[in-house]
Regions:
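Conserved Rossmann-like nucleotide-binding pocket used by diverse enzymes
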Residues: 6, 26, 52-54
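Structural microenvironment flanking redox-active thiols in thiol-disulfide oxidoreductases
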Residues: 58-66
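Conserved helix-turn-beta segment immediately C-terminal to the redox Cys motif
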Residues: 18-20, 37-56
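Non-catalytic, surface beta->alpha helical segment in thiol-disulfide oxidoreductase systems
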Residues: 78-105
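A short beta-strand-turn-helix
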Residues: 3-21
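Short pre-active-site segment immediately N-terminal to redox-active cysteine/selenocysteine motifs
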Residues: 18-19, 25-29, 72
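Conserved redox-active cysteine motifs that mediate thiol-disulfide chemistry
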Residues: 25-39
Length: 105
């Protein structure tokens, strides 16, 4: 299950998470984001209980995008213990995302 992040739940869901967190920064008008969306959903199912999968709509949550230095979308950031440890900018294959996650768990 993917969690929609906003300024109210970001700290608890990402920064204070006991497990690694994958955060997908996206926008509805972004073509590559639409291509990545089913991959992110698949990752949420595949890693359920091991990795928390979250999404941030940059149009609705500009402050979170700025806080994470998002300049291009889609951008996926992996967090461990509240710290960003890996950033993947642009559309990637599921293998790329799985490799990045597997390095952390």
């Amino acid at each position: 299950m993917e969690i929609e992040l906003n300024s109210a739940n970001y700290e608890g869901e990402v920064l204070k998470s006991d497990i690694p967190v994958l955060v997908d920064f996206w926008a509805s008008w972004c073509g590559p984001c639409k291509m990545v969306a089913p991959i992110i959903s698949q990752l949420a199912e595949e890693y359920e209980g091991k990795v928390k999968v979250c999404k941030v709509n940059v149009d609705n949550e500009g402050a979170l995008a700025a806080q994470n230095a998002i300049v291009s979308i889609p951008t996926v950031i992996l967090f461990v213990n509240g710290k960003a440890v890996k950033k993947l900018v642009g559309a990637h294959s599921i293998d790329d995302y799985e490799d990045a996650i597997d390095e952390l768990i």
